């Protein structure tokens, strides 16, 4: 599993920076077959750099984003390129710097507000929800708030209950916010660039375990003009027997499960990468369900009021319901605060075997 690989590369320490420095010396590399590749970390970094060059109203603000190059080195080199007025270190006060960033957006700038982890965004949720998300509506469309809130989200590795929460259901329920959750380097680059250019607040939920993962990247995605539209999911693996839907690192779990289903049962699973939480691309999901007649959702949030619950409800309310041959199955985080113990933590987070079991239930395989 990705979450167990090269742990030293994903923690925000000076030691991890030494481990990483040799692998991110350039934006992308070419594999042995000539396919260009890029890490999610470099995709996010290049997206911010290009948008800061493109628009001098864009600036980055947050804890350790400047002199330390970011806790996870996402902002590596930006201070040297743009200076301390556009790459701004802050004290440890999420309420303070989020309020500053939101006010700057109201004044016409385009802040990128980084949370070291989205768990800390709880300290600033009033600014995000009551100020950034609602002011356009409450001002009768007069006062926009072009701001990006970004940082790592969801379970990581042995960081316990207060640092492992998944915020897609939280922010995905708020009118006035757009919420995206990238899986691949191409997702991260295209969605972040689109978020920075958007005239309204966008929440970008990243995953720290994916930061160091390398993905193939197309020539189109390397263009400075590349953006991905919100509300458009991607079929990562075509299939005909069952639909598996995930977002961010849950796509990894879904793809692993699809491989197991193929190898063990000859089942061809279609895997959908949501990319966008709000707006949600229910049309792509429904089209897949009409083909496969079965669906399993996978995410690392809690099942109650979660992403899978929303997908299940919308499928039930759509004409895709008539195509279902089995109830929707949800695979999600165990309904407990995240344990610190690694073995218990691993048992709390969805894995491929759990997804396979859910798929077998849908397919009536004993």
UniProtKB/Swiss-Prot annotation:
Its cofactor is thiamine diphosphate. Its main location: mitochondrion. One of its GO terms (molecular function) is pyruvate dehydrogenase (acetyl-transferring) activity. It comes from the Eukaryota. One of its GO terms (biological process) is aerobic respiration. Keywords: Metal-binding, Mitochondrion, Oxidoreductase, Potassium, Pyruvate, Thiamine pyrophosphate, Transit peptide. Tetramer of 2 alpha and 2 beta subunits. K(+) binds at residues 147, 195-196, 198, 200. Disulfide bonds: none annotated. It is found in: Mitochondrion matrix. Its EC number is 1.2.4.1. One of its GO terms (cellular component) is mitochondrion. The lineage of its organism: Eukaryota, Fungi, Dikarya, Ascomycota, Taphrinomycotina. It catalyses: N(6)-[(R)-lipoyl]-L-lysyl-[protein] + pyruvate + H(+) = N(6)-[(R)-S(8)-acetyldihydrolipoyl]-L-lysyl-[protein] + CO2. The pyruvate dehydrogenase complex catalyzes the overall conversion of pyruvate to acetyl-CoA and CO(2). It contains multiple copies of three enzymatic components: pyruvate dehydrogenase (E1), dihydrolipoamide acetyltransferase (E2) and lipoamide dehydrogenase (E3). InterPro entries: PDHB_mito-type (IPR027110), THDP-binding (IPR029061), Transketo_C/PFOR_II (IPR009014), Transketolase-like_Pyr-bd (IPR005475), Transketolase_C (IPR033248). Thiamine diphosphate binds at residue 94. This is Pyruvate dehydrogenase E1 component subunit beta, mitochondrial. The keyword Mitochondrion applies.
């Amino acid at each position: 599993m990705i979450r167990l690989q090269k742990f030293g590369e994903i923690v925000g320490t000076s030691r991890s920076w030494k481990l990483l420095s040799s692998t991110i010396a350039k934006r992308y590399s070419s594999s042995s077959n000539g396919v260009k590749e890029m890490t999610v970390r470099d995709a996010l970094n290049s997206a911010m750099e290009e948008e800061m060059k493109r628009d001098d109203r864009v600036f980055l603000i947050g804890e350790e984003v400047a002199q330390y190059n970011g806790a996870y080195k996402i902002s590596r080199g930006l201070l040297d390129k743009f200076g301390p007025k556009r790459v701004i270190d802050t004290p440890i006060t999420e309420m303070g710097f989020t309020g500053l960033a939101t006010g700057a957006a109201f004044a016409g700038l385009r802040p990128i507000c980084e949370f070291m982890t989205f768990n800390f965004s709880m300290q600033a949720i009033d600014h995000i929800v009551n100020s950034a998300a609602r002011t356009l509506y409450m001002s009768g469309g007069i006062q926009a708030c072009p701001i990006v809130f970004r940082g790592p989200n969801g379970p990581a590795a042995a960081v316990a209950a207060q640092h492992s929460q998944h915020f897609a259901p939280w922010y995905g329920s708020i009118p006035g916010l757009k919420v995206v959750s990238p899986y691949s380097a191409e997702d991260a680059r295209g969605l972040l660039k689109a978020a920075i250019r958007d005239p309204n607040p966008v929440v970008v939920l990243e995953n720290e375990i994916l930061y160091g993962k390398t993905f193939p990247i197309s020539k189109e995605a390397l263009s400075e003009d590349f953006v991905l539209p919100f509300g458009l999911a991607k079929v990562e693996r075509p299939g005909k027997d069952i639909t598996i839907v995930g977002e961010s690192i849950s796509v990894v779990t879904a793809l692993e499960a699809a491989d197991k289903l193929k190898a063990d049962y000859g089942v061809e699973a279609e895997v959908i990468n949501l990319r966008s939480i709000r707006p949600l691309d229910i049309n792509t999901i429904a089209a897949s369900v009409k083909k496969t007649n079965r669906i399993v959702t996978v995410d690392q949030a809690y099942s109650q009021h979660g992403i899978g619950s929303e997908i299940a409800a919308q499928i039930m309310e759509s004409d895709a319901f008539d195509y279902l041959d089995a109830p929707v199955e949800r695979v999600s985080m165990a309904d407990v605060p995240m344990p610190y113990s690694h073995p218990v933590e691993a048992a709390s987070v969805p894995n491929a075997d759990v997804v396979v079991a859910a798929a077998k239930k849908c397919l009536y395989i004993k």
